[in-house]
């Protein structure tokens, strides 16, 4: 009965299956956690969604920015970019079923027994756990409702970039979405910087990676996240697990077995190209 945490799949279906075979994943007894961005860039987004959905209660996942962008494309709000390689998924006979399932997935996973949290980009140091849970539920409720296209149309944007309990309406939902799915750097006060994608050693002052700023959640829980492939899984404090190692860019697909903290990797079938792109506000 193992728990396997896997980083951003990005349509790399063959590598996902090979990695699960490597760790001898057994859906009847094991649990799979996925950091989001199941789709885009790799060639197998349709197969990834079909497979992950078929796992039922054996899988837990969080939504990433590319997953949200896919939903916006399907809703006719955003443009389908050839580089995302989403056309087979969008034209599939079961696309409606798959994407209605996808939009009902959470932004945040919390396991109190394991003291483990997963979010695609991480947890802003401005939030305590109760706030993070409430904020996740706010966006999840809208995504699960019939008005979800209205939200998807309004989610694009970098502002507001500073949390306040007084935020309301679409501004509040946009901040929450950015914090959970796009965040990399923060100012020392926790305010989000939505522009820098440099590696931490090259980040302009006074920016710091979100995980380098102490916050109430990171002090009490382990946090697993994806999104930031250029970290290559390195440079995070104890208890912070960066799992996106750029499989779709030619890197690796990484798995962490939670019980003994052992890592497993599956090399990408693609050539190395660690340039990163944003789906939201590309």
UniProtKB/Swiss-Prot annotation:
Alphabetically sorted, this entry's keywords are: Hydrolase
The record's EC number reads: 3.6.1.41
The record's catalysed reaction(s) read:
P(1),P(4)-bis(5'-adenosyl) tetraphosphate + H2O = 2 ADP + 2 H(+)
Keyword flag Hydrolase: yes
Hydrolase recorded as keyword: yes
Superkingdom field: Bacteria
Sample GO molecular function, one term: bis(5'-nucleosyl)-tetraphosphatase (symmetrical) activity
User: Could you tell me which InterPro entries the record lists for this protein?
Assistant: ApaH (IPR004617), Calcineurin-like_PHP_ApaH (IPR004843), Metallo-depent_PP-like (IPR029052)
Quote the Gene3D superfamilies the UniProt record gives.
Answer: 3.60.21.10
Chain coiled-coil ranges = none
Q: Which SUPFAM superfamilies match?
A: Metallo-dependent phosphatases
Which CDD domains does this entry report, sorted A to Z?
A: MPP_ApaH
Summarizing the function annotation, the protein's role is:
Hydrolyzes diadenosine 5',5'''-P1,P4-tetraphosphate to yield ADP.
Q: Which HAMAP family match?
A: ApaH
Q: Which family does the similarity line name?
A: Belongs to the Ap4A hydrolase family.
Name assigned to this protein = Bis(5'-nucleosyl)-tetraphosphatase, symmetrical
Q: Name its species.
A: Salmonella paratyphi C (strain RKS4594)
What is the primary gene name for this protein?
apaH
């Amino acid at each position: 009965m193992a728990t396997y945490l896997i980083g951003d799949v990005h349509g790399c279906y063959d590598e996902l299956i090979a990695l699960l075979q490597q760790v001898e994943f057994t859906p009847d007894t094991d649990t799979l956690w996925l950091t989001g961005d199941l789709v885009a860039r790799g060639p197998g987004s349709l197969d990834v969604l079909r497979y992950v959905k078929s796992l039922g209660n054996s899988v837990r996942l969080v939504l990433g920015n590319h997953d949200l962008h896919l939903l916006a494309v399907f809703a006719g709000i955003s443009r389908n970019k050839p580089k995302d390689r989403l056309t087979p998924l969008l034209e599939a006979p079961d696309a409606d079923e798959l994407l209605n399932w996808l939009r009902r997935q959470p932004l945040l996973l919390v396991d109190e027994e394991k003291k483990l949290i997963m979010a695609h980009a991480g947890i802003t140091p401005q939030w305590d756990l109760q706030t993070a849970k409430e904020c996740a539920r706010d966006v999840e409720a809208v995504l699960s409702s019939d008005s979800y296209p209205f939200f998807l149309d309004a989610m694009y944007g970098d502002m507001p970039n500073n949390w306040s309990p007084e935020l309301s309406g679409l501004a509040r939902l946009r901040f929450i979405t950015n914090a959970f799915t796009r965040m990399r750097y923060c100012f020392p006060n926790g305010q989000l910087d939505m522009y820098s994608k440099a590696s931490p050693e090259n980040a302009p002052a006074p920016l710091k990676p979100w995980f380098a700023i102490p916050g109430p959640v990171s002090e009490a829980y382990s946090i697993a996240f994806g999104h930031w492939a250029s970290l290559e899984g390195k440079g995070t404090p104890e208890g912070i697990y960066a799992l996106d190692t750029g499989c779709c860019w030619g890197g690796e697909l990484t798995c962490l077995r939670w019980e003994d903290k052992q890592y497993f990797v599956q090399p990408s079938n693609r050539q190395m190209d660690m340039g990163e792109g944003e789906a939201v506000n590309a």
